[in-house]
């Protein structure tokens, strides 16, 4: 075990580790969202819900960092470069390559793979919001207040039945 980090799983056969510093960032992201951004933008929720939403956002942030690092790792593996581990830490993540890329083109492709995954993930998220036909704030509002969505749908159903009769 690497000092100050813990293995949390494997992806592509590569050990995924979380460094102790990750927990500091997790707490800072969660607390800043729960005590600042979320109450200001989604008023009226319980404190527990703000903290839960902040924690989910922090986990998703680090999930995106992990996918970014897996992008680097995947391309490195296509060049038969072994990856000893991926570590998530305070400044993001790092894919530990056991050797240097064989040529500049391979090095460039490995380097650009992580940002390409991040751009693709961002486009996927924007596309999902666009396909849902609502802005990000509206989507967050629906996630935060699902009972209001259900009530509106029930009301619409009631009105529709009365109009048909």
Residue ranges and their predicted role:
Residues 12, 91-92, 113, 121, ...:
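Short glycine-rich loop/turn motifs that provide flexible caps or phosphate-binding loops at active sites
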Residues 106-117:
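Alpha-helical transmembrane segments of multi-pass membrane proteins
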């Amino acid at each position: 075990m690497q000092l100050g980090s813990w293995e949390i799983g494997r992806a592509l056969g590569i050990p995924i580790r979380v460094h102790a510093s990750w927990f500091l960032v997790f707490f800072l992201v969660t607390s800043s969202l729960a005590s600042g951004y979320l109450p200001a933008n989604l008023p009226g929720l319980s404190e527990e819900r703000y903290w839960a939403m902040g924690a989910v956002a922090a986990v998703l942030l680090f999930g995106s960092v992990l996918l970014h690092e897996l992008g680097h790792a995947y391309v490195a593996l296509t060049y038969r470069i072994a990856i000893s581990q991926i570590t998530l830490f305070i400044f993001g993540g790092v894919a530990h390559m056991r050797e240097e890329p064989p040529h500049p083109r391979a090095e460039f492709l490995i380097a650009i793979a992580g940002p390409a995954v991040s751009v693709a993930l961002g486009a996927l998220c924007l596309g999902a919001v666009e396909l849902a036909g609502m802005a990000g704030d509206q989507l967050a509002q629906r996630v935060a207040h699902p009972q209001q969505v259900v009530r509106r749908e029930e009301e619409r159903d009631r009105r529709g039945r009365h109009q048909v009769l």
